[in-house]
């Protein structure tokens, strides 16, 4: 019997609390969003591009300038410190068809010499395979 009384009391208090919650929710202002009005556009790309080096192909889609930052200052600095990273970047340079002469104006002498060594080693590995 006491269990029934406790359960009834619990349900009654739960209903009272939920009614109070609903009353406080009704006072909340709802602001309209301009994003919903333009649902068909991509929000992050809806701005106009001005000076970026991005080409638009014949389908109207962006094409990134591949290899445009191969010789950025941060990459060159990291290559001087981290030999594993340097080897990965050397492989990228090689994949883009850059010779030692191509990279010379962009890199310090130490990296130019290291790249020449890298290419010689890769050549020997390919010959021996």
From Swiss-Prot:
Localization, UniProt: Secreted; Host cytoplasm; Host cell membrane
A Pfam family it matches: RXLR
UniProt keyword Transport present: no
GO cellular component: extracellular region; host cell cytoplasm; host cell plasma membrane; membrane
Motif (RxLR-dEER): 42-64
Primary site of residence: secreted
UniProt keyword terms in alphabetical order: Host cell membrane, Host cytoplasm, Host membrane, Membrane, Secreted, Signal
Stretch forming the signal peptide: 1-16
Assigned protein family: Belongs to the RxLR effector family.
Function summary: Effector that suppresses flg22-induced post-translational MAP kinase activation in tomato but not in Arabidopsis. The perception of highly conserved pathogen- or microbe-associated molecular patterns (PAMPs/MAMPs), such as flg22, triggers converging signaling pathways recruiting MAP kinase cascades and inducing transcriptional re-programming, yielding a generic antimicrobial response.
The record's note on its domains: The RxLR-dEER motif acts to carry the protein into the host cell cytoplasm through binding to cell surface phosphatidylinositol-3-phosphate.
Stated name of the protein: RxLR effector protein SFI6
